């Protein structure tokens, strides 16, 4: 087996085991309004000396409280401080001494008794840590879960024998304590003033769900260790740095992924003018086209992570609709076969080709996943009658198709609590959520269920005719999308030709200038002038030569007698003179020859210069012809942009450098048109119509699948195929399902690896890496969205202890550390992303989103500088609003006080509620029912205390018709509560 995967999972399992069982806050109190004596009571008491506490009059409820709930008592046995065992744990790994011990109050085991003293055996719990501590020293790789389950079952069984059907007594409790020490580690506290045995007082209402006290994730990690799938293996191994590709501002990749062929055929039907930002669209196109095992997107709240997920959801819906469009009639989507030959009836199985589009949204934050599932079906997502649009005809077309889906609107409205356009996503996860969904789709007696709606619709329509019409409509729109893409692809070809010809055009233009300059700067005239001067000089020399010849001849005739006499007498003067004339003659001849040579050379130069000019003229003519041809070639592109002014092209202006150009670029997307945007949104709605008709056309098969889902726990062992098919049916009814990681295993238990086709993890930066293992093991593809610089995962174990585990299993720090999250691991497994930070402290993040649509200055500028390297972009419309004075406010209120209980500072709460009262008064004076304000707190205790205080203060101030309690719970919460708002 892969050593890194095995060691990492082992380290994560051990870390999960190290979570202790914690006592409730020992300083907290129960409200006096609960009790008959009208006195507040401490929530936790010392219980070292046993007595029948259920008979204590202090804990007797008044009549109103009794009608709504009951008192129960939770016993915490063998209590200790976590720091006491932390040193022991670290000694196992040969780690150093603890200097700041963890002072959390922990217990060995716990159980509850009712208000009559009877033990509620189902509440018996032993933290797995107590089993691990008993055996860990001898074997760090021991399968603790198997050992724990075996010992816990034996412990519980013997506890039942000891208790029987009797009330708890001192003797029975002593026997339970002795039995506990046989199977689990026993620690007694050495701290003074701390309860060795404690009891908690709890007011329990019927709807309260007991929490699973052991880690939710260990079983799935043990399951994954046996046969990890490719997605989980990639998640743990990541990608080598040398293989990572920076996509931010990468011209090659951005232009590639924004070609029409990379755009999904379908998109979420938002307003046509509301296009995605540059990196949003790059992310959508890359994820849907490449179908990689792991993709990740990074951006703070407000950058459109959920928005891009909607487009990905729409893509998968359209792709499944294409498989439906291959059917002649909807009933062909199912096949009937017996699981066993002895079965009385066959099971209706959804054909395999239609099952490859199961989508799950998961998070560690329940509010996040519920928000997504409840937002998607909202009527405003598709039908926007009160919102103005640049394209009212497109909006009307969307609404007309959406009307065909209102058969499911009533059920969707019951599920999300407000007006809905149709059935699309389901809030699953906790049993209560699933039961609520199943009530609406199958079992409700108070309203018409989905099951009944489908059967009635099947009996009242000609389903095959409707199918034929809907299929034709879908295929027509799909063809239109392909035509528009082809049209834009032709534009891309024209643009490529234009860009290429533009480069050549510039080269030709430069060459023309150079050729013309060379022609202008030729030296023919100077050569001709020099030739003329030479010819004049030659003529002059010829004249001199002729004159000299004539003079010599004349002199020769006159002086012939004298010369002979002088010669006779021995005189030489005449001979000397003749020699001088001959010398002059020779010099003139040489000069003439030189002049003639120069003239010949100049003639040659003139000929060459003329030839060069003629050649340049011919080249100029050819270039001018080429330029004319290039202009013709460019006309195709010029015609395209004239006919498609709404299509953004990656021209020189688009890729211009500078901050202003960068901001402009980040807001735009390439190679799409308003019409293509519209048709893609329309295709999604028509795909949903096909899904609707598949449900109606297979009403009985859907009913069968829903009943199988209702009874899925009965079939886990006897007929697992039924359970798998039932989940396929559920994913057909609800294309998108949401759940928390904590509920994933209980939901999809026994489902094989790779069962989920697409897993989307929202706010992945808030989740510890091991939380997602069970989900990833069951997923073929993972898309993680989040922001590592926002809220980090909540880790309750000391950093040094985590480091000890990491070193013991020899795994990289990126996998096991206090800073690791699902987001950081997903980013590390994504080949596309961005190196963030300075040299030496660089961090690899996934595809970055830079356009922030939910922030105003000055907060935008502050955050951008602190956390985002000033890469974030404020949209143009927000900047325009700033010019009109629409900006945010930032201020601080300095309040001093002490925290009690826990993190709540009463003095701060008073000031906050006073400010809140002012907001309410202002809102009511302006005619509004309630103010538009959020109070965000760092801790849950602060939230609950402020809600309690505000409820009391607002009661006399606000009209009784207004549900103040509901408003407070929606408007006051922790940072997690308001993620995405």
Locations of regions flagged by a protein language model:
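Conserved helicase NTPase catalytic core signature
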Residues: 217-275, 590-593, 597-755
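ASCE P-loop NTPase helicase motor core
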Residues: 273-442, 583, 622-625, 629-632, ...
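Long, amphipathic, heptad-repeat alpha-helical coiled-coil stalk/linker regions
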Residues: 398-404, 408, 412, 416, ...
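A helicase ATPase "motif cassette" and its flanking acidic/Ser/Thr-rich regulatory loops
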Residues: 1-204, 636, 644-668, 672-686
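Conserved helicase/translocase motor-coupling segment
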Residues: 864-954
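Pre-P-loop entry segment of helicase/translocase ATPase cores
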Residues: 162-286, 322, 326, 408, ...
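Conserved RecA-like P-loop NTPase helicase motor core
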Residues: 792, 966-981
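Conserved helicase motor
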Residues: 741-746, 940, 971-978
